[in-house]
Amino acid sequence: MFFKLFTIFFFFIILLSKPLNSSSQSLNFTYNSFHRPPTNISIQGIATVTSNGILKLTDKTVISTGHAFYTEPIRFKDSPNDTVSSFSTTFVIGIYSGIPTISGHGMAFFIAPNPVLSSAMASQYLGLFSSTNNGNDTNHILAVEFDTIMNPEFDDTNDNHVGININSLTSVKSSLVGYWDEINQFNNLTLISRKRMQVWVDYDDRTNQIDVTMAPFGEVKPRKALVSVVRDLSSVFLQDMYLGFSAATGYVLSEHFVFGWSFMVKGKTAPPLTLSKVPKFPRVGPTSLQRFYKNRMPLFSLLLIPVLFVVSLIFLVRFIVRRRRKFAEEFEDWETEFGKNRLRFKDLYYATKGFKDKDLLGSGGFGRVYRGVMPTTKKEIAVKRVSNESRQGLKEFVAEIVSIGRMSHRNLVPLLGYCRRRDELLLVYDYMPNGSLDKYLYDCPEVTLDWKQRFNVIIGVASGLFYLHEEWEQVVIHRDIKASNVLLDAEYNGRLGDFGLARLCDHGSDPQTTRVVGTWGYLAPDHVRTGRATTATDVFAFGVLLLEVACGRRPIEIEIESDESVLLVDSVFGFWIEGNILDATDPNLGSVYDQREVETVLKLGLLCSHSDPQVRPTMRQVLQYLRGDATLPDLSPLDFRGSGKMLGMNHRFSESCTFSSGSSIAYSIVSGGR
């Protein structure tokens, strides 16, 4: 019985004396080289083992990492809460850089809790950490970095340093690469010198001091360490840890090597390496292509440079010729007198960024309008490109455009100048930021104008048209008054624009026009019959515009049910006959508006759109009616159908002046001629 108890007690004592960790351990190991396949060495990433026994952590792959681990865990603590035991390691390293003075980041020796660094990044992170875990205490990593790039974000001192790092790429302490000799003199070393260097890393569990020492390969270990720091590693190390090397590349081609390695825990120093067995630095030289560039490129360059010069000259000449053709303009002697009003096509091309569709403001039967910014003055402009297939009357047309450009009125869009190129004419206007009036009237507009704004636009256009007819030095017949040619400035003031069809004549005379031009729905019947444009034909178009603004409808609309054209003038006239003319008002106005002003505008619109030009008021009279300086004749629908005297004579119409709204618009014609 006593013997059995003694046996059990003895077996229990043996169990207690065994390590708690059942994993295999290695208290020391030595690799004088790494012959394939190396025992207990795991390589990851782009790391390889060369045929001559060198651990090659990286190749010439950019932005990559390479790792090498000792596969067995090393027990650094007797228990999880115990202190870290003393350990010592020595290894031989070397770095090759494709450019002798610049490297693609460095390498490191590390002790980590796991045999893989899955989240580690390349470049400045050295394959140790990432942008998300750098500096975290949960990393539990001790590293000795051999860095060849200065990264200010990690407080690096230079681009050739050794540092002791704990859980971070910011070194606890670092030093310029070198060693102290026997006479205590510091000697510099260069990591990318393509030479082997031996490193010793020692930790003393009594003093908690970490020493890193370096020397050229073949030299004895210096007595004085290169970098020393006192740090208790108990909170950094777990009970079992893994050893290894890491390296990373950037955009500069570089390779990192480990030639030999020994390690010991719970001992004074690591086993010494047998230096004669440590592999030599690999012969890394230029490739055949690099040798070609070095030896043959000078001769090749002598032959290539003249060829490149000739080819470049040909392309340059072609570029200049094409550029000149691209910006070529037509210029005749008679245009000399208009020189200051003529703008360069090149400036307009760059102002509109090549007349791209994204800067297209609108298009119509007479051209397309683009927004632009003049390169030098930064002035915003609108450029209208008008087809000019016929050269007949071109000189007179340009002369009129230049004359119109001299006009100045707050309700006219300033015409800044013109440009003539090939078969087109370009007219340049001030840019109006709020666009044309039509987009605020039709098709459920996103932004609607209240009556006060609309009435202000009407007054503005009437003022501008009165200036054209009576106040300027010559009479200007606009010939294309419509909602899309009324532009709104930043304060929503109405400005009459687009003088591409305008004609000039002296006061007291009529312009000699023989062609009908204008836009459907705005042409007066007398203009269609005779081809003559007068101030009265402008008044007719203005009358249609008045009805558009008040009703929010187009001059001509198609009925969905009957597929027939419905004339706005006929529709408003029908409401007037029924005695409820205000029912023609735009529903978007709501119920808050000046009914007297709206009724005046509607009746004045019908009066201006009368089929007899003699009955239509002048723009002077129109302004007086709108401003309240004169009273609109007391009109009724019967006055437009019955007998009476002419407007201005007892405010009646003659029997011969019948209101024929259908004929006034139904035969409107669009023509590109003059």
Swiss-Prot record:
Task: Enumerate the spans annotated as Protein kinase domain.
Answer: 355-632
Signal peptide coordinates: 1-22
Which residues carry a glycan? N21, N28, N40, N81, N136, N188
Catalyzed chemical reaction(s):
L-seryl-[protein] + ATP = O-phospho-L-seryl-[protein] + ADP + H(+); L-threonyl-[protein] + ATP = O-phospho-L-threonyl-[protein] + ADP + H(+)
Which is one Gene Ontology cellular component term of this protein? plasma membrane
Q: Where does ATP bind?
A: L361, G362, S363, G364, G365, F366, G367, R368, V369, K384
Q: Give its E.C. classification number.
A: 2.7.11.1
Q: Which residues lie on this side of the membrane: Cytoplasmic?
A: 318-674
Major site of localization recorded for this protein: membrane
What parts of the sequence cross the membrane?
297-317
Task: Tell me which InterPro entries the record gives.
Answer: ConA-like_dom_sf, Kinase-like_dom_sf, L-type_Lectin-RKs, Lectin_legB_Mn/Ca_BS, Legume_lectin_dom, Prot_kinase_dom, Protein_kinase_ATP_BS, Ser/Thr_kinase_AS
What family does the database annotate? In the C-terminal section; belongs to the protein kinase superfamily. Ser/Thr protein kinase family.
Protein name according to UniProt: L-type lectin-domain containing receptor kinase IV.3
* Organism expressing this protein natively: Arabidopsis thaliana (Mouse-ear cress)
Q: Which gene encodes it?
A: LECRK43
